């Protein structure tokens, strides 16, 4: 039996959806204002610039004329690390999601927000949307900064750029969710700082961000493929240099699994967090 169209129910559903979106946007704006300041913005520029133009060219002198293979293309080390810094910077920027929740817990702001017409799921989604926006802005910034270093090798198309876009978004979701999980479990500031720093160092250096995994010892090379940053960086590079192939789609699928799993765990962690 077909159901009759109920205009009142449809109108109510529309209003509820509008309120949901409005609440999330309000929290996103609040998160962006709270998490970004002059020091944060300067660091987002200075850190990748130092790695690209100091570390990149210094290591290039050691490597010599040997290129690094990405797909069917041989690129310079400066191009390699410039593209790698996009994923690395996304990981660093994603820390704002955990920082927001950590500070809200300590300052009692989380309780105040829940008294207002905001739900826990809206809180999580808004934190991740803010993280994605910062991640995309960071990626665009690194591309602009690294353009002189990558100019001779870069080969962007709309199709390949979409892979880089997906890598940045999925990477932001994973690392944003990961920092949310840590912030809900850790009790002290000292432990929060030590654990965050240690884990992010592991993510950074047991990955393909700074060097190709093919030349690493076997155990380290295998470990890097359990690291989501490896997939973020690989997909980003393959998009930047138009070296997308069937394996890139497999990497996207694996990254989706990492990101969706982390998001589910982060949502449950917030739902169980005591006010």
Cite the ranges covered by each PLM segment.
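Alpha-helical transmembrane segments and their short interhelical loops
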Residues: 120-196, 201, 244-269
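Junction motif at the cytosolic side of a transmembrane helix
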Residues: 2-8, 62, 240-243, 253-275
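Hydrophobic alpha-helical transmembrane segments of multi-pass membrane transport/permease proteins
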Residues: 23-25, 36-64, 78-93, 136-138, ...
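Hydrophobic alpha-helical transmembrane segments of membrane proteins
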Residues: 71-100, 167-172, 177
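Transmembrane helix segments
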Residues: 57-63, 183-226
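Transmembrane helix boundary and interhelical loop/hinge segments in multi-pass membrane proteins
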Residues: 93-118, 275
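Aromatic- and glycine-rich beta-strand/loop motifs that create alpha-glucan
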Residues: 2-49, 108
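Membrane-interfacial helix-loop-helix junctions in multi-pass membrane proteins
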Residues: 34, 155, 207-261
